[in-house]
Swiss-Prot record:
Topology relative to the membrane: Multi-pass membrane protein
Chief localization: membrane
Oligomeric and partner information: Composed of six subunits; NqrA, NqrB, NqrC, NqrD, NqrE and NqrF.
Family: Belongs to the NqrDE/RnfAE family.
EC number(s) reported in the record: 7.2.1.1
Name of the encoding gene: nqrE
Transmembrane segments: 11-31, 35-55, 79-99, 114-134, 144-164, 180-200
Protein name: Na(+)-translocating NADH-quinone reductase subunit E
Lineage top rank: taxon: Bacteria
CC per GO annotation: Gram-negative-bacterium-type cell wall; plasma membrane
Intracellular or extracellular location(s): Cell inner membrane
Function, as annotated: NQR complex catalyzes the reduction of ubiquinone-1 to ubiquinol by two successive reactions, coupled with the transport of Na(+) ions from the cytoplasm to the periplasm. NqrA to NqrE are probably involved in the second step, the conversion of ubisemiquinone to ubiquinol.
EC category: translocase
Length: 202
């Protein structure tokens, strides 16, 4: 149990998707103007990462990995080169299924997140999570915990940035830095803050 708790904490703080690896920057900057919308997108990212990571793990471990098809009498087949394409397909399919499910059963939540759900398909933080899973050889349970932790890390970062950007509207920012300029500086300072966790061994 300790291993999974440390994996979750490491995913949220030490290896923050947005502020340590700078993944998902396009939506991170574009949707961080209001806290409400940032939290909505953050929750959607948590759900998608929490679902796609274990699904991709099952597909990779049982079909794509070198020797994974031994159960089918094909122990020498290595389909790992199809990993990237498979992960993209799984992410796109699961986002569509999630979108249709929310539309049918939870229309209020769909109306709140509907605009942001398609953006998640092209969020490289989702793909990054699956590639880290393969590189670090996580099992199914570790993939699930890491997926949820990575989603929480991205949601935490975008919510924090949105809060700061809302306050910056009332600040006296120099003309040359208004808009994206001060946003990039803010992200850099937030990233420096999260670097303080880099020495933590879990």
């Amino acid at each position: 149990m300790e291993h999974y708790i440390s994996l979750f904490v490491r995913a949220v703080f030490v290896e923050n998707m947005a502020l340590a690896f700078f993944l998902g920057m396009c939506t991170f900057i574009a949707i961080s103007k209001k806290v409400e919308t940032a939290i909505g997108l953050g929750v959607a990212v948590i759900v998608v990462l929490g679902i796609t990571m274990p699904v991709n793990n099952l597909i990779y471990a049982n079909i794509l990995k070198d020797g994974a098809l031994a159960w089918a009498g094909l122990p020498e087949v290595d389909l790992s080169f199809l990993g990237l394409l498979t992960f993209i397909g799984v992410i796109a399919a699961l986002v569509q299924i999630l979108e249709m499910t929310l539309d049918k059963y939870v229309p209020s939540l769909y109306n709140a997140l509907g605009v942001f759900l398609p953006l998640i398909t092209v969020n490289c933080a989702i793909m990054g999570g699956s590639l880290f899973m393969v590189e670090r050889d996580y099992n199914l349970a570790e993939s699930t915990v890491y997926g949820i932790g990575a989603g929480v890390s991205w949601a935490l970062a975008i919510a924090a940035l949105a809060g700061i950007r809302e306050k910056l509207k009332y600040s006296d920012v120099p003309a040359g830095l208004q808009g994206l300029g001060i946003t990039f500086i803010t992200i850099g300072l937030m990233s420096l803050g999260f670097m303080s966790f880099s020495g933590v061994q879990l």
